[in-house]
Amino acid sequence: MNSSPAAKPVDGALFDMDGLLLDTEIIYTRVSQEIVSRFGKTFDWSVKANMIGRPAIDSSRYLVETLNIPMSPEEYLAEREELLKRYLPQCQALPGAEQLIRHLRRHRVPIAIATSSSQELFAIKTRRHRPWIDLFDVVVTGDDPEIKSGKPAPDIFLVAASRLEVAPERALVFEDAPSGLQAGLDA
């Protein structure tokens, strides 16, 4: 007979941000499609699925090579950054995200954001959501000097757990991307 393993108590929660707390994926898709369409290419799920949750330079390299577009990953990133700064301030919270964070805060559960986004893009994305984003005890961004490797490496979740003063094995990770899920499991 298969029985579910007993639930283990947790001492803290670690959250990815893009596509989990904030609905930014639609904006990233729009921006990428806007760039690659100039070269007659399509940014579809087969490409996007391999980019979600990875550091920006790795994702950009994958896109440029896979779609064979005539620009360097750095050029793509620079153009993408400008477009993101225009569109990201309008991103919406995903349904239930704010309520969950407020619930955890009321129950004194330590919470952290562990996002691959840079500090600059984090600030742009969260500007409209500060009343509940500020409830997080810790925010770790992808450009944090302690992060040696991006997702799927566990670094970002290990740093977030450490700053929360929670043992990684006693933290619950909330993730939506395959690379992030692997990072959470490895942490």
Regions found by a protein language model. Give the residues of each.
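Active-site neighborhood of HAD-like aspartate-dependent phosphohydrolases
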Residues: 2-49
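Short helix-capping segments at alpha-helix termini
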Residues: 38-41, 67-71, 130-135, 165
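Hydrophobic packing residues within well-ordered alpha-helices of enzyme cores
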Residues: 32, 60-63, 97, 122-126, ...
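Glycine-rich phosphate-binding loop signature in dinucleotide/nucleotide-binding domains
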Residues: 6-8, 106-109, 164-170
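Short, acidic loop-to-helix structural element flanking the phosphoryl-transfer center
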Residues: 9, 86-113, 119-123
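A metal-dependent, Asp-based hydrolase signature
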Residues: 52-83, 103, 109
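Substrate-recognition "cap/lid" segment bordering the active-site pocket of phosphatases
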Residues: 90, 118-172, 178-186
